Amino acid sequence: MRFVKHILLLLSLVTLSQLNAQIKISGKVVDDDDNPIELATIRIAGTALGVNTDLKGMYSLSIAQKDTVEVVFSCIGYSDVKRRLVEPKGQITLNVRLYRVSKELAELQVTEFKKQTTSMQTIDGKAYKLSPDVSGGSVESLISTMAGVSSKNEMSSQYMVRGGTYDENSVYINGIEVYRPLLVTSGQQEGLSIINPDMVGNIAFSTGGFSAEYGDKMSSVLDITYRDPEKLEGSVALSLMGGSLSFGQSSKKFSQLHGFRYKRNTTLLGSLETKGEYDPQFFDYQTILNYKITDKFKVSFLGNIALNNYRFVPKNRTTSFGTITNAKQFKVYFDGQEKDRFETYFGALSLNYRHSKSTDFTFLASGYLTNELVAYDISGEYWLDEAGTSGDSSGDDVIGGELGVGKYHEHARNRLKASVLSFSLKGNTSINKNNLSYGLLMQRENIYDRSREWELRDSAGYSLPHTGNGVDVIYNMTSRHDISSTRFTFFAQDSYKYLSGAGLFIFNGGIRLSYWDFNKEFLFSPRISVGFVPAANDRFSLRLASGIYYQSPFYKEYLESVTDENGNSHYVANKNIKSQRSIQVIFGGDYTFRALNRPFKLSAELYYKNLSNLIPYEIDNLKVVYSGRNESKGFVAGIDFKFFGQFVPGTDSWISFSLMKTQEDLNGVKVPRPTDQRYSFALYFQDYFPKFPKIKFSLRAIFSDGLPTTSPRSTRDIAYFRTPSYKRVDIGASYQLVGGSADGVRPNNFFRHFKSIWLGVDVFNLFDMANVSNYYWVTDVNNIQYAVPNYLTSRQINVRLSFDF
């Protein structure tokens, strides 16, 4: 009996020791670009044990000790990786790199889609590299083809998102918010986008419902990450509108990437109806330097210098508009010139400290400086006539009746200097299935403004406005300000993944607290989102997001126009201004499937925004003129669709379609907001010759509703009308001179140093559509106003040549 007891005791001890012998396996899963892969699955072969990686690609699981353990790493769109552990013990670190699944057809790639479980979508900018684009393949031009996004000016990098203005979009580069010039009023002046597409590594974009880590804007977030070069690399691009150069290099501890761009789109501006001497010169230099001090410390520097100069000497203009039965012609002869200068300097230093595998901190210090000058003195003599069948038919123009004759003079000396200095500390901590993010920010803003502009008109011998008591200007405005203010911000959020029998749940919740000493305003912004991938059918993914978002005013938004007893207008800073508020609810989903052995994805999002404390504004081309007062409320509601896939094997194409309505209560009258674009359609399509894939074609098409507008110094509650719809098709063809061979062998000559060389031809505005940017208003002595359309660019041909090495 005692023998049996001893045997049972021995068996119990052995069993207990086996139960206590646990192995802990942890590590990180990255892709072939060293980017962390979230939601990758790590499982133990032959068992039901498994976990998913967090937002940083980290994982951890514990298993009972065995002689041999096989760990399987998998993720949709990537090849599985297996690791066999022989007699594992204790804690084991296992870092794995997954490579994308692809079927090569020369250089064409067929890739699965990553599931979107949050409001932030990842965009592949490489698909847009050879696109026919006036801006030269800018990221913003790519963004404007997404669902819910629109752009009304091909010469500008600005875009509108779901009923918001250009000023309601946040743009980040490597975690640092960047800004655009404040005095730009037209696409001709704007120059180069602050984002250099040759340096971009990752693009993340949200049209609403974004998390608490992103700043106080109401509409969208564009988060850009510049890439780290892995070795010596570079590219050169030349076209009729400018050129670019980028090169990078990497060693064990140090990496650098530099980009130069130059733009001179004289031929494009020459297609405008206003003829004259256009002399635009836009230059941009950017650099990012990374140095790994130790395994725990890394320091980075991001720098940018942008010098944009625009000089224009107008000569004449002839514009025909109206209908067949009510045709009109507007003629102007000019004298004078415009000279603008926009200088931007930006620098950011970041220090990253990895405290442990689960915690890291980043300290950021950045400075932004803009020095802007808009100066013009332009006079003109104009004739507005009714085109008809009467008059002297032997002349070039057949004129009916004269509607307006006059002279005008426009003058401006607008100078603005602004600086933004910010310091922030951000951290990330992973605890089990939770990923905590938090941060503090202090931002100091300084504005120096000395602006003066006026306009004088003389119609048929009378100055406008005609009072009979002397000569008055039709418009004048002055602005003199020296303003300094400080903002403080804190955010904290948690991301949590939960795998149940029903499927995978992804939760994100956070708060954002802000204080601005200019108006003594404190803001509390809670935000939450939930993503779900059902286990019954993982081709579906659903997401729901909601939160309170604020548009914290910047300089233009809190300037209020005041007119004195002499009729002179000037801007004053409204210190009682409040942040505009948007309460958002967004519900969306994706469905991925395969057809013709190719991947496709159909996405849809339904959204509603309740708007309050609105600052009414009017849009004139790219100029947004705010009232400077919180005096309106409204809403935005709509639905977005996007069909994405490989309509042609190995190429990404997409179709976007949006329906939207936005309205506000302005002075007791319900009117559409200036961004009320009721419908929008965008297409980006790529193709190639199946037997000769070195020749590629790409097409970009946009068709969108016109926007509400009104006459100068008026408001929509009095009267408004809609501009014509925006219609544009750009097409391009590219031929790969070097690279792309099926066997991957490079030529045995000088061109062996190049990865690829592309020669391309683009046709901008293929169907020569006459799109309207804004209107020039002619007023006769009887105070009758005529809206003369200012048309955008007509059909143009561009030739480009690019080298990658």
Regions found by a protein language model. Give the residues of each.
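Short, acidic, small-residue-rich periplasmic hinge/interaction motif at the N-terminus
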Residues: V30-D33, A40-A45, E70-S79, P88-P132, ...
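Gram-negative outer-membrane beta-barrel transporters
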Residues: K497-A502, Y607-N610, S627-T710, S802
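Membrane-embedded beta-barrel scaffold of Gram-negative outer-membrane proteins
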Residues: T362-S366, N576-R629, F635, L759-F764, ...
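Surface-exposed extracellular loop regions of Gram-negative outer-membrane beta-barrel proteins
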Residues: A535-V585, L606-Y626, R700-S714, A770-N774
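Face-selective signature of the C-terminal outer-membrane beta-barrel domain
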Residues: K292-L307, Q337-N519, S603-L606, W654
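Periplasmic N-terminal accessory/gating domains of Gram-negative outer-membrane beta-barrel systems
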Residues: S79, I92, K114-N169, G175-F210, ...
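C-terminal beta-signal and adjacent terminal beta-strands/loops
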Residues: I702-T710, Y735-F805
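Predominantly transmembrane beta-strands of Gram-negative outer membrane beta-barrel pores used
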Residues: N202-E213, S219-Y226, E233-E277, D284-K292, ...
